[in-house]
């Protein structure tokens, strides 16, 4: 399989979405889901390595950017024996998490993408959405409704 032809068929936004999902996924959950998928052979293009990145922020989300602080990340890249290439960047020092994320990224560019999506990405997306809704429900429960009463004084 020609990796160049395969890579051109993939929508960039879709790939960014699944790579973000894999990076945010809890490592134990991703490892558990990976057990249901046949692990393909691969060679390392870049073994997992730990480094730091500067995290930038903006005041109010729209202001001038500023350096918020540094964060540890692990990155890697690999090529499946069938030619597909996968990349991963994950927060923290978990090399196994980065490897699993890169494997899924590579498999999503190959012929088994629909099976990998059903076995790995869909459960991760469902769990992430459920956690988001639970967090929103907890926040909603603490919401205070303020109101103004008209006083009889002139």
Regions found by a protein language model. Name each.
Residues 1-14, 78-90, 137-142:
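Solvent-exposed, charged interface segments at domain starts and junctions
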Residues 15, 23, 109-154:
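Cysteine/selenocysteine-centered motifs that mediate thiol-based redox chemistry or coordinate metal-sulfur cofactors
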Residues 71-73, 95, 149-151:
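Short capping/connector residues at structural and topological boundaries
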Residues 82-122:
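A hydrophobic, small-residue-rich beta->alpha segment in the mid-to-C-terminal subdomain
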Residues 1-37:
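Charge-rich, low-complexity N-terminal segments
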Residues 30-32, 41, 132-133:
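Intrinsically disordered, low-complexity boundary segments flanking structured domains
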Residues 36-81, 87-89:
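Structured beta-strand/loop patches that form or line metal/cofactor-binding pockets in enzymes
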